[in-house]
Amino acid sequence: MSAQLPIIVVGAGTAGCTVVSHLANNTDHPILVLEPGGYGNDDDPQFLNLSDTDLLRTSDDGYVQARAMGGGSAVNGLLLTGDEPEHLHGLTRYAHAQDIGSVGEALLALGGRFSRLWWNGGRWNPGRAVRHLMEENRVSWLPRSVTELLLDGDRVIGVDCNEEPLRAAAVVLCAGAIASPGILLASGAQKLNPMIGVGVQNHPTITAQFSLGAHLPARFDTAVVREWSTSAGGQMLNVGYERVAKNLDGVGALSVSLMNPISRGRVEISSNHMPHADFQYLAADEDLFNMVEGVRDLIRLLVDGKFTDDPESITVEGRPLVDVSAWDDDDMREWLRRSVRGVSHAASSCAQAVDSAGRVLGLDNCWIADASVLTHVPTETPAASVTMEALRIARNIGESLS
């Protein structure tokens, strides 16, 4: 690396790889990416084959986050429920009948549709481009986790990796909507910017499981979705899963998620500086109402659909379907408050902590370019929104440092 200080990009997930690729191709600055994760298999269409690898990390409170070059795009379920980003045209495709199994077929019969997939001859993973840049010596990589920022007053001058200081010309946080604010909080930056970590969201989700019996394997673990709206305007998403785990082909699943939640929480750090998110799922009455309606609809799908030949095998978050079906709305609300879960879609934890260019307010020389800065959790699977926002902020960074 030259004597010139590098731009340090913290995290090589979907956002980080997008930022690295743009800056490496559009600035003269050396680029150093810090990412503790390794590489996955971009040629395996069944994402659950990655579920027991070191490419995933589960926090003490159960939140699952990628730990891989390419981040969530290296390990996700491949669903792109929204539009294909213009700058990635041709790198995705729609699923078709040869891709799905019995669960997808049952959901199609109930109004589902084939989803667009982050797949076209292989998984779209922005980590591939970064890997090529590394092979060409245009980008440097260290397998490090950043613990905090190095500050000189309100100016960010580098990062600390477990007492290994690294100086930087600029720092771009792309560690995700929990880890990025966590790094800022561990650095004491909340004294300069009290909105760090405030407003985090996720998609509240309930999942049913059922026995599949004899069935043919599907090419993709999930490829069919169903979108609908509640009477109150809740945007709901059903996803069918052809299996629930790598070595559990005999069990399928059907989930329902609220895609436009109102409830917001915050990211905080523990006494040992580990970040965690309190999402405040269903804190807003509107969200609770929509999820009650969502579960009622899920029950109807499970009863009317041909998901299983063994109705007694159906459970909803571990409770027999017959029990859940019998509850009145009060019982359902009480159960939902205890049982609702999230998915790996954390967003918006720093939307109020940055300016329109992605600069962290109160700090000089520091940007955030990941899902943290989205104004709300996307109403579709989030990778498209994340990569578009990361590219926008990367362009801003490139212009400001040129």
Annotate the PLM regions.
Residues 77, 85-156, 162, 309-340, ...:
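Conserved redox-cofactor binding core of oxidoreductases
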Residues 1-90, 191-224:
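N-terminal glycine-rich phosphate/pyrophosphate-binding loop and immediately adjacent elements
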Residues 33-34, 141, 368-369:
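Short hydrophobic beta-strand that contains or immediately precedes a catalytic carboxylate
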Residues 44-109, 113, 123, 254-276:
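Redox-cofactor-proximal catalytic regions of oxidoreductases
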Residues 37-41, 152-153, 177-178, 189, ...:
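Acidic glycine-/aspartate-rich tracts in secreted/extracellular proteins
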Residues 8-10, 34, 146, 165-185:
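Short hydrophobic core segments
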Residues 18, 170, 181-263, 289, ...:
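Mid-to-C-terminal "cap/lid" subdomains and adjacent gly/pro-rich loops that border
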Residues 278-289, 297-402:
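C-terminal lid/capping helical subdomain adjacent to the catalytic/cofactor pocket in oxidative enzymes
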